């Protein structure tokens, strides 16, 4: 079975007209979770993307980013929702379909010039990933690449990210599905 075949699709969630891609069915399966981490590890060992640290976006980016950090021998830095980090933070507000949200990172999380692999579970509109990239840059980091389990190219996030000059890698796409 493939990574894609282990992802549950839920129609009309969280609202009518949305096809939700649920990775919990993928990561609860030990073979599926291993496929994710092994494929990402292999990609980053073989493809010469130079980075120093992995930054994971709350919450599922922690699951993937933490395991990948361990597999690659890299440090892990969390990007969190407001009020969850105990020391001084940098914040980044970003727009959602209906409203806005904010994410934070410790101001001392990265060394100046650190090359970062930004990790999250799914790329849809790209808003959260671009906000996280802005945060990384605010605290002195450089985004080397963004990695996702799932890319939804039809939603437009991939193009938004590429238009900003960032590189992305995803394990599977749900295009036109």
UniProtKB/Swiss-Prot annotation:
Pathway: Purine metabolism; AMP biosynthesis via salvage pathway; AMP from adenine: step 1/1. Transmembrane segments: none annotated. Pfam families: Pribosyltran. It is found in: Cytoplasm. Its EC number is 2.4.2.7. The keyword Cytoplasm applies. Its main location: cytoplasm. GO terms for cellular component: cytoplasm. Keywords: Cytoplasm, Glycosyltransferase, Purine salvage, Transferase. One of its GO terms (biological process) is adenine salvage. PROSITE patterns: PUR_PYR_PR_TRANSFER. GO terms for molecular function: adenine binding; adenine phosphoribosyltransferase activity; AMP binding. InterPro entries: Ade_phspho_trans, PRibTrfase_dom, PRTase-like, UPRTase/APRTase. It catalyses: AMP + diphosphate = 5-phospho-alpha-D-ribose 1-diphosphate + adenine. HAMAP family: Aden_phosphoribosyltr. Catalyzes a salvage reaction resulting in the formation of AMP, that is energically less costly than de novo synthesis. Homodimer. PANTHER family: ADENINE PHOSPHORIBOSYLTRANSFERASE (PTHR32315:SF3). Belongs to the purine/pyrimidine phosphoribosyltransferase family. This is Adenine phosphoribosyltransferase. It comes from Chlorobium phaeobacteroides (strain DSM 266 / SMG 266 / 2430).
